[in-house]
Amino acid sequence: MCIRDRPLSVSFFGKGDFYALRASGSSMTGAQIDDGDLVIIRQQHTAQVGEIVVALTDEDKNTLKRLLYDDDRQSYYLHPENKDMEDIYVSGLRVQGVATHVIKAL
């Protein structure tokens, strides 16, 4: 990556292993993550409630959602930041990483 023609080191994002993914769809627009944005992900397999995570669904598909906890069901679930979409409950949550930054095109 470059900012004003200067290389941008991965260390700019902090400590850890990072990768970028391109957001697809409108499920996270309420968190200002829009279709086509680049999302910087810190690779890790744990996350805190409230963080935006990349997780595998029961169908082994990656999804970018907010991690929340349902006290009644005593389980974690994935929450899209779009009121028109439903929460995703998975039997075995597999976190792949945590979103740390969003890069938008101007």
Predicted feature descriptions by range:
Residues R4-D5, S11-L106:
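Acidic/glycine-rich C-terminal interaction modules and beta/coil loop segments
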